[in-house]
């Protein structure tokens, strides 16, 4: 009976990833990565392990709906980076979607705003057409540096989604931009 009412967002995303050729599997519950990006008002639905990727795990978070608000989901992509401790803690950027008419209009453009500590991420991500297209279609994206038990970066998508091959390749591309950002900063100093 409990299985019938359980939220299957994690199972569905795992199935979608395998369908497009990404080798993914469900991790055991109470995985250490379930706490990454998890706030008091959210609960983790579990982690998906991804093989042969710069994003080795995905955590799915949910905020249950209330009387006046629907449930919400966040998809957290983990990007490990041992060099992250060298980068300033303020690194946190997110997409700003500009609409033709406030609230209801079509999305005309996507830019990145926030603090990238001179890494050049905002400029790199803002001019990439594939990343703009992904953000227009799937929602807001946010990149944060993590310095706790998990050392690296998180890419957070603020809703459920069913990835296509192009979506996954673009997410991998974002991860590669993030992982190469320190080299850009080092070149700039010279």
Model feature map: region roles:
Residues 1-91:
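Charge-rich, low-complexity N-terminal segments
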Residues 30-34, 40-42, 66-72, 80-190:
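Charged, low-complexity intrinsically disordered regions
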């Amino acid at each position: 009976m409990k299985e019938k009412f359980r939220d299957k967002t994690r199972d569905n995303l795992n199935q979608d990833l395998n369908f497009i050729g990404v080798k993914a599997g469900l991790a055991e519950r109470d995985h250490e990565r379930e706490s990454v990006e998890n706030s008091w008002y959210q609960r983790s639905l579990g982690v998906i392990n991804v093989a042969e990727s710069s994003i080795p795990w995905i955590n799915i978070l949910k905020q249950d709906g209330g009387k006046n608000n629907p449930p919400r989901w966040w998809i957290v992509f983990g990007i490990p980076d041992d060099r992250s401790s060298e980068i300033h803690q303020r690194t946190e950027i997110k997409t700003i979607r500009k609409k033709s008419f406030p609230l209801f209009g079509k999305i005309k453009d996507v830019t990145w705003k926030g603090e990238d500590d001179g890494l050049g991420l905002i400029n790199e991500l803002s001019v990439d057409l594939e990343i703009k297209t992904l953000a227009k279609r799937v929602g807001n994206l946010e990149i944060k540096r993590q310095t706790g038990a998990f050392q690296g970066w998180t890419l957070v998508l603020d809703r459920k989604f069913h990835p296509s091959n192009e979506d996954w390749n673009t997410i991998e591309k974002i991860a590669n931009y993030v992982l190469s950002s320190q080299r850009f900063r080092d070149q700039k100093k010279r």
